């Protein structure tokens, strides 16, 4: 067993012994299908703490021919696969964490020299009877020619150089050239599997590593379910640890990934695994994933001087989606032509989620929303912070059926934030959602809830642990009247969809008069 060549199963055994272990061995069935084929180059990009390193440790333990890991994998899902035993412990594995080499050196050139030296040392120690060159490519060719066992190459944190040497384009190109020379069109490779946060860097319209099939946050392909926790997995943990699933969903859900295949499309609701595990073990909801980086990282990007960027962030804070074009993103952290490129980067970093069907980005959950507020509180977006801070009072005014205070609070938000200019009821909706930001502490907020004879504009349904709070139906009108909004709620029987809350249900009609530029509000309580 070497440090990098056939490193054994110690790391994977550590995962298996953990208090919480979710079986993701189905990934192995996917990698087995591409071994030794044109599709043997796989690159997975996900945010920090989404299980990328754990997956690499699992693959190393499964393929490593210098150890016997059958007893571990016999208990996992992969053991049900037809080709399970065919590939188990049959390959020479090279497992590398590129960050380790970057941190130990002062330049890209030094990093690559150290990498090659350490890998060649492992090869010579393992195959001391063979004459092995001091060039990594030739050394691996020599070993393969003698053993006829191809290599599984696992590279974790492959993109660390792009994150730490953000401005050094020459170093980035040389690094990509090295990877291409080492990996491309090599018979000694059965599988080249890389993981990182960023997709593979593009220069112009070309990629130096165009042989890789990429699986990212914007296009996860058939690997969507293997990184992060699925909703079913989280439900199981909630039962085991006696945690409220509805609250877990509000805090950590929100990454919507779609797998497209000839066998049928699958939609996954993916949860942040680091956060879910900590919440279960601590038996407490909080911000856990974000501790891996400070809010300063987010702040750098959302305060960039990009046309429309601030407006988009405000819209998303209000719960709206923003349509973007992900195609112009250069897959680095410095090349931004438009706000869409910045927002695409935030998707890959985990600060936004992308819906490939609507092509819209949104803030995924309460945990990440808090990170935006932390960043904005240290910026000059004072009007946004005031609106968020005042939303607590606005929610209380709604509960108290203080219609004048609700109208005044909404008006303040509209007057303070320049992007909230009204053209119709949709633009009024953005103002309402930002004004009632604090309501998310208690409610699941649904836009256009299907009801008796139509769709209610906004419904606030209290989560189970806040069942003492009233459910709320809000109907919006633009240049009409608030009383008419209440009448529409009753006429179209919107109340029917929330009849379980009768006796604790508020109806709110809100209108904006474009002539007087004022808001009016009417609030009624529905009695049994």
Model-inferred region functions:
Residues 1-424, 439-442:
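Phosphate-binding site recognition
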Residues 142-147, 440-467:
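Active-site metal-binding core of divalent-cation-utilizing nuclease and nuclease-like domains
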Residues 152, 470-474, 506:
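Structural motif
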Residues 172-177, 478-495:
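Mg2+/Mn2+-dependent nuclease catalytic core
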Residues 436-444, 500-502:
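Short secondary-structure junctions
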Residues 497, 503-528:
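Domain-level recognition of nuclease-like catalytic cores that cleave nucleotide substrates
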């Amino acid at each position: 067993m070497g440090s990098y060549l056939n490193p054994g199963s110690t790391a994977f055994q550590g995962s298996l012994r953990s208090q919480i272990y979710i079986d993701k061995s189905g990934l192995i069935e996917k990698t087995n299908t591409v071994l030794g084929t044109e599709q043997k180059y796989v690159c997975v990009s996900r945010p920090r703490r989404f299980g990328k390193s754990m997956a690499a440790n699992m693959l190393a333990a499964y393929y490593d021919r210098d150890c016997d890991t059958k007893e571990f994998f016999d208990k996992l899902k992969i053991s049900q696969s037809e080709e399970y035993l065919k590939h188990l412990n049959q390959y020479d594995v090279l497992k590398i964490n590129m960050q380790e080499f970057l941190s130990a050196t002062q330049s890209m050139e030094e990093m690559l020299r150290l990498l090659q030296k350490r890998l060649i040392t492992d090869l010579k120690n393992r195959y001391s009877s063979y004459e092995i060159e001091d060039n990594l490519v030739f050394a691996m060719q020599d070993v393969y020619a003698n053993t006829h066992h191809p290599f599984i190459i696992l590279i974790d944190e492959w993109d660390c150089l792009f994150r730490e040497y953000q401005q050094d384009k020459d170093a980035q190109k040389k690094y990509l050239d090295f990877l291409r020379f080492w990996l491309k069109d090599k018979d000694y490779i059965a599988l080249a599997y890389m993981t990182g946060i960023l997709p593979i860097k593009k220069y112009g319209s070309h990629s130096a590593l165009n042989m890789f099939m990429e699986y990212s946050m914007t296009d996860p392909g058939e690997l969507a379910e293997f990184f992060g926790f699925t909703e079913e997995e989280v439900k199981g943990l909630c039962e085991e640890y006696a945690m409220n699933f509805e609250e877990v969903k509000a805090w950590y859900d929100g990454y919507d990934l779609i797998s497209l295949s000839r066998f049928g499309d699958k939609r996954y609701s993916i949860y942040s695994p680091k956060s879910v595990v900590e919440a279960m073990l601590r038996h407490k909801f909080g911000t856990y994933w974000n501790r891996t980086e400070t809010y300063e990282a987010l702040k750098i990007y959302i305060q960039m001087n990009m046309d429309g960027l601030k407006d988009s962030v405000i819209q998303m804070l209000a719960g709206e989606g923003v349509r973007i074009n992900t195609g112009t993103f250069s897959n680095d952290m410095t090349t931004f032509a438009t706000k869409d490129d910045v927002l695409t980067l935030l998707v890959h970093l985990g600060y936004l989620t992308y819906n490939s069907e609507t092509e819209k980005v949104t803030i995924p959950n309460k945990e990440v929303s808090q990170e935006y507020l932390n960043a904005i509180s240290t910026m000059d977006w004072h009007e946004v912070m005031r609106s968020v801070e005042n939303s607590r009072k606005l929610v209380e005014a709604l509960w108290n059926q203080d219609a004048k205070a609700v109208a005044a609070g909404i008006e303040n938000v509209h007057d303070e934030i320049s992007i909230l200019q009204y053209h119709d009821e949709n633009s009024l909706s953005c103002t309402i959602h930002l004004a009632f930001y604090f309501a998310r502490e208690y409610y699941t907020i649904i836009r256009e809830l299907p009801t008796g004879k139509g769709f209610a504009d906004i419904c606030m349904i209290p989560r189970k642990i806040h069942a003492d709070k009233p459910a709320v139906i809000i109907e919006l009108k633009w240049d009409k009247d608030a009383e008419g909004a209440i009448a529409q709620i009753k006429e179209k029987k919107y109340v029917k969809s929330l009849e379980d809350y009768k006796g604790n249900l508020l109806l709110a009609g809100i209108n904006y008069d474009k002539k007087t530029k004022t808001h009016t509000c009417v609030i009624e309580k529905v009695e049994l």
